[in-house]
UniProtKB/Swiss-Prot annotation:
It comes from Dictyostelium discoideum (Social amoeba). The binding of ribonucleoside triphosphate to the RNA polymerase II transcribing complex probably involves a two-step mechanism. The initial binding seems to occur at the entry (E) site and involves a magnesium ion coordinated by three conserved aspartate residues of the two largest RNA Pol II subunits. GO terms for molecular function: DNA binding; DNA-directed RNA polymerase activity; ribonucleoside binding; zinc ion binding. This is DNA-directed RNA polymerase II subunit rpb2. It is found in: Nucleus.
Length: 1170
């Protein structure tokens, strides 16, 4: 009874449990605060606010002394020797600007797009110049500092909607005045007017020990590897390997290590001795921890025996130095070895002096891990586990690039300073700093997508891509893409497979088909990528909480029983009460004293506690559960709804939700829904859950969240729809009239779907839809919908069904060839202009531009432009004198027609005149156009019947589309059938149907609802044949389904040719529709003709219609002879033959081949049969 009462007033009770509806309130709060491209923006802001300053602070000051002029390398010996040094200090970034008529002005993103500018902000830096005079020994040392304020060092492209973008704080009205769309999420750059995205790059985790088993062909059985890199500063990673060899017939072999800059593999024990641990006992204490462990001690024996010879640190260092790159005296070698051990080996542990203890402990730990794996006590690592992956977003990517460019800049400053000192000139900061280095370096990489400076070799391509603007969903999806930089050729299946740990982080369905399958992924809806925070606070906290530091451990055997503590892969100490430490850390994270994105992983089996604060980890939010109760209650929901101040951030800081990354996820138990937390009355086992999913449908990404009932479809169908949803036409952005995109498709009358999912709200799919609700019947009706084609209703098309507008923009610029010759926009005249096209010049005005509203057809000139010819020499005769200019106009594409929509004439960044012309054409659906439902069921239009020829129901309803029933059974897209049923209910009741996956909507419930309205339960209806008016035998499944028109239209693909342009080299027809090329009769077609025995046809295709050519050959030697047909004289000079010459026909390509063979002294002799 009391239970019943509790449920009754759950609305008023603030401590009541939450309902399914409340969960969506929380999700809405998340997206309101985060948006959909937060990961891009946060990462970029981190780069601007912290990384750039760090990089500049890290770079050492430039210090120089004057060199003697005649003995380079020797310092001038005199009393008043000055030492100059230059140090870069604080940086400043101003608002985005651009040069307009030589004046720097603020620029809005839309201006940048239209005028092909780069949306970037100038970067300034303070430079401190120090001059030291006199000498220390005499005590008259003087030092003068001079601070040069705000020296311009380059421009940094700004990500739209980031902290430094002018759209950051703007509200909807401001955005409209700036010509921006309020739905646009930002997260991309504008480089030379085109929008560029940085695709997140996946990589292996640094500073983490991996142990892998090697297969027989390799000579090692187990390999432990670690990619080590310092926390601050992206110095390149140094990788270290420890290798365990297979036991040979001579007995067991020792463990070898690969040390950076040392050419051979070195025995492990020698490395320990070089670190200063000489006695065997000391070394084994660092590796085995427990001397009672006989098996492990046995494994170490061969290693100790093999390094028995070397018994002191000096000898060990010399052993390493000998195998290094520098050969010198013994002292130099030892110094080299010490340097390598300090700076290059495991740099993440320490690069400071007195590094030995820490490094020995860590090195021992790596060895320990290798031994554990070879004893099969600890499982091997999984390369594809998502905890072992990190994502490089815009921040780290720009960071590495900026570091390389800044290095280059300092090098230039150094050279300039040296010149100043040698010539005793004044040091002028503005001329010392080449601002172009950083500006053009960043611009080049973002424009081409080639990442990394050209010479260092580490270039990746395809990192920056042009933002896809076909549909709004395709734009969003492109901003949330992940790329794995593995060669696409490798047929490796493992990295491509869906891994358990992808749950909730990567969309399971959205990935391309073909060679990039599984390597290009997309983020799930609520996935969050850590920005990274400093590890210092955590280290200080551990220090307070009785962590034993590695240097302080008195009894080394206690390591075996204690828990090791790692922070970002660095072993910082051991602890004897890990459970207390763990709960304290979690508590601190939940109340916000430690950053929310820190992950705390306790590995109980391996006695390790790993803490991570690094950037690029994938996390996702979950509800916190304590004592099997969700911490979020009705009161929090009410606050979210009613209180504008209460946001997602407050839920985090109150410890109601928390971010869990892929590694910590392995140590928690997650309930699927809050209902799962209520224990069944008769269940034996009660699970102790620690967290609860917010909503299972959040495992999907952008494109799959548009699919209704994806949990009722066969999985590849969802993948196909994810790819096709990106090609659907809709309104791709609301300011499309103000933009000049190269290509754009806009549907005339987009509709929001009758059957929606809850996630669509956050994708703005209701405001910017890409499709229409059409009435679909599943029937055969004539044979015009076989093999995935569909029958359309011509009358509906005439009323505007699926009509769309296609825009294409053409651009041109008056470039300067030289100082004298400048191109001009004008109407070219035939008598003064050389090289004019065959298109019509009538449409353009005298200023060289076509007026808006003019109808243009293929090959018409729309931008007239002339280039002056260089004044020619007199001896070329009078013929060339007439022409003073050359025509370099832009013509409309030959296969298109349309109406000029908009013409913009402006100046480009360099101050030249520059224009863009946009042409629009209406596209009416016709036979051959492609359509698809939201379930991967694509089809082309096979026939369009008028309304009176189509079947109709009792109510007089005529379908708009008829789909063939054969498309359903083998593809198992049951989701489409349920959508049709639910659509029928929605259309009748006027409510939106909810098709969110993993909810409790059942087909039975929908059928019942349909039955109530008065339709047949399964959605079938009696229909009448449109041709005869008779009742059809079968009942037909009919109802509204959401269909998309895809961008593949027959008008853009139709192509034929009789005669046309040929290639110069082979004289065969060129390839491609845009060049009016031929249709290739390929090898397979040739083989078919051979098997048919159609010899004459074969000759016609491959010879007469392709590149027939007439050659004269000498009958004596069989080589090509000289023929002059005008004079009717023939001769072969080799044979002194003028009479015995034959004329033959052969393909021009064969003639070319023969001549190339002749150039290589091979004589292909041809003899005719007389």
């Amino acid at each position: 009874m009391s239970d019943y009462m509790m449920n009754d007033d759950s609305q008023d009770n603030p401590h009541a449990d939450i309902s399914q509806e409340d969960v969506w309130t929380v999700i809405s709060a998340y997206f309101q605060e985060k948006g959909l491209v937060r990961q891009q923006l946060d990462s970029f802001d981190e780069f601007i606010q912290n990384t750039m300053q760090e990089i500049i602070d890290e770079s050492p000051p430039i210090t120089l002394r004057p060199e003697s002029q005649h003995h380079p390398g020797q310092a001038v010996v005199s009393n008043n020797v000055s030492t100059f040094s230059v140090k870069f200090g604080q940086i400043y970034l101003s608002k985005p600007t651009a040069e307009i008529d030589g004046v720097s002005q603020q620029v809005t993103p839309n201006q940048a797009r239209i005028r092909n500018l780069t949306y970037s902000a100038p970067l300034f830096v303070d430079i401190t110049k120090t001059v030291m005079t006199g000498s220390k020994s005499k005590g008259d040392e003087r030092r003068t500092d001079e601070v040069l304020k705000r020296i311009f060092i380059g421009k940094v492209p700004i990500m739209l909607r980031s902290q430094y973008c002018m759209l950051n704080e703007a509200d909807d009205r401001d955005l409209t005045t700036m010509g921006e769309c309020s739905f646009d999420q930002g997260g991309y750059f504008i480089i030379n007017g085109s929008e560029k995205v940085l695709i997140a790059q996946e990589k292996m985790n640094n500073n983490h020990v991996y142990v892998f088993k090697k297969s027989p062909p390799s000579k090692y059985s187990y390999v432990a590897e670690i990619r080590s890199c310092q926390e601050t500063g992206s110095r390149p990673t140094s990788t270290m390997y420890l290798k365990m060899l297979h036991n040979t017939n001579k007995g067991p072999v020792g463990i070898k290590a690969t040390v950076p800059y040392i050419k051979q593999d070195v025995p492990v024990i020698i490395v320990f001795r070089a670190l200063g641990f000489v006695a065997d006992k000391d070394i084994l204490e660092h590796i085995c921890y427990d001397f009672k462990d006989a098996q492990m001690m046995d494994l170490m024996r061969p290693s100790l025996e093999e390094s028995f010879v070397i018994q002191s640190q000096e000898v060990a260092l010399d052993y390493l130095g000998k195998r290094g790159s520098t050969m010198g005296t013994r002292e130099q070698r030892i110094k080299f070895a010490r340097e390598v051990l300090q700076k290059e080996m495991l740099p993440h542990v320490s690069v400071a002096e007195f590094y030995e203890t820490k490094k020995a402990f860590y090195f021992g730990y790596i060895t320990h891990r290798l031994l554990l794996a070879s004893l099969e006590r600890r499982p091997l690592d999984d390369r594809d586990h998502f905890a072992n992956k990190r994502l490089d977003l815009a921040g780290p990517l720009l960071g590495t690039l900026f570091r390389q460019l800044f290095k280059k800049l300092t090098k230039d400053v150094r050279l300039y300073l040296q010149r100043c000192i040698d010539k005793d000139k004044e040091f002028i900061a503005s001329s010392a700093v080449k601002s172009k280095t950083i500006t053009s370096g960043l611009k080049y990489s973002l424009a081409t997508g080639n990442w990394g400076s050209s010479k260092s070799g580490g270039t990746k391509s395809g990192v920056a891509q042009v933002l896809n603007r076909l549909t709004f969903a395709s734009t969003l999806s492109h901003l949330r893409r992940l790329n794995t930089p593995i060669g696409r050729e490798g047929k490796l299946a493992k990295p491509r497979q869906l891994h358990n740990t992808h749950w909730g982080i990567v969309c399971p369905s959205e990935t391309p088909e073909g060679q990039a399958c599984g390597l290009v992924k997309n983020l799930a809806m609520m996935s969050y990528i850590s920005v990274g925070s400093a590890s210092q606070p955590i280290l200080e906290f551990l220090e307070e909480w009785t962590t034993e530091n590695l240097e302080e451990i008195s009894d080394l055997s206690s390591i075996f029983s204690a828990t090791k503590i790692f922070v970002n892969g660095m072993w910082v100490g051991i602890h004897h009460q890990p459970d207390k430490l763990l709960s304290t850390l979690r508590l601190l994270r939940r109340c916000g004293d430690v950053s929310v994105e820190v992950s705390v992983v306790r590995d109980i089996r391996e006695k390790e506690l790993r803490l991570y604060t690094d950037p690029g980890r994938c996390c996702r939010p979950l509800f916190v559960v304590q004592d099997n109760k969700v911490q979020i209650k009705k009161q929090h929901i009410n606050k979210l709804i009613n209180n504008d101040e209460y946001k997602w951030q407050d839920l985090l800081s109150e410890g109601i939700v928390e971010y869990i990354d892929a590694e910590e996820e392995e140590t928690v138990l997650i309930a699927m829904t809050p209902e799962d937390l209520v224990p069944m009355p008769n269940e034996q086992i009660v699970h102790t859950y620690t967290h609860c999913e917010i909503h299972p449908s959040m495992i999907l990404g952008i494109c799959c969240s548009i699919i209704p009932f994806p949990d009722h479809n066969q999985s590849p169908r969802n993948t196909y729809q994810a790819a096709m949803g990106k090609q659907a036409m809709g309104v791709y952005i609301t300011n499309y009239q103000l933009r000049m995109d190269t290509m754009a498709h806009v549907l005339f009358y987009p509709q929001k779907p009758l059957v929606t999912t809850r996630s669509m709200e956050y994708l703005h799919f209701r405001e910017l839809p890409a499709g229409q609700n059409v009435c679909v019947a599943i029937a055969c009706y004539s044979g015009y919908n076989q093999e995935d084609s569909v029958i359309l209703n011509q009358s509906a098309i005439d009323r505007g069904l699926f009509r769309s507008m296609f825009y294409r923009a053409y651009k041109d610029e008056q470039k300067k060839q030289t100082s004298l010759m400048e191109e001009v926009f004008e109407k070219p005249e035939r008598d003064t202009c050389a090289g004019m096209r065959h298109g019509s010049y009538e449409k353009i005005d005298d200023d060289g531009l076509v007026a808006p509203g003019v109808r243009v057809a293929g090959d018409d000139i729309i931008i007239g432009k002339t280039t002056p010819l260089p004044p020619s020499d007199d001896d070329l005769g009078p013929k060339t004198r007439r022409h003073t200019k050359r025509d370099s106009s832009t013509a409309l594409r030959s296969s298109e027609t349309g109406i000029v929509d908009q013409v913009i004439l402006t100046t480009s960044g360099e101050g030249f005149k520059f224009c863009k012309v946009r042409v629009r054409s209406m596209r009416v659906p016709q036979i051959g156009d492609k359509f698809s439902s939201r379930h991967g069921q694509k089809g082309t239009c096979g026939m369009a019947y008028r309304q009176e020829d189509l079947p109709f129901t009792v109510e007089g309803i005529v379908p708009d589309i008829i789909v063939n029933p054969h498309a359903i059974p083998s593809r198992m897209t049951i989701g489409q059938l349920i959508e049709c049923l639910l659509g029928k209910v929605s259309a009748s009741t006027g409510d939106e149907g909810d098709a969110t996956p993993f909810t409790d909507v059942t087909v039975e419930a929908i059928s019942q609802a349909l039955h109530k309205i008065g339709y047949q339960m399964t959605g079938h209806e009696v229909m009448y044949n449109g041709h005869t008016g008779r009742r059809m035998d079968a009942q037909i499944f009919i109802g509204p389904t959401y269909y998309q028109r895809l961008k593949h239209m027959v008008d853009d693909k139709i192509h034929s040719r009789s005669r046309g342009p040929v290639q110069i080299l082979t004289r065969q027809p060129v390839e491609g529709r845009s060049r009016d090329g031929g249709l290739r009769f390929g090898e397979m077609e040739r083989d078919c003709m051979i098997s048919h025995g159609a010899a004459q046809f074969l000759k016609e295709r491959l010879f007469d219609q392709s590149d027939s050519y007439r050659v004269h050959i000498c009958d004596i030697c069989g080589l090509i002879a000289i023929a002059n047909l005008k004079k009717n004289s023939f001769e072969c000079r080799r044979c002194k033959n003028k009479t015995q010459i034959s004329q033959i026909r052969m393909p021009y390509a064969a003639k070319l081949l023969f001549q190339e063979l002749m150039s290589m002294s091979i004589a292909p002799r041809m003899f005719t049969q007389t």
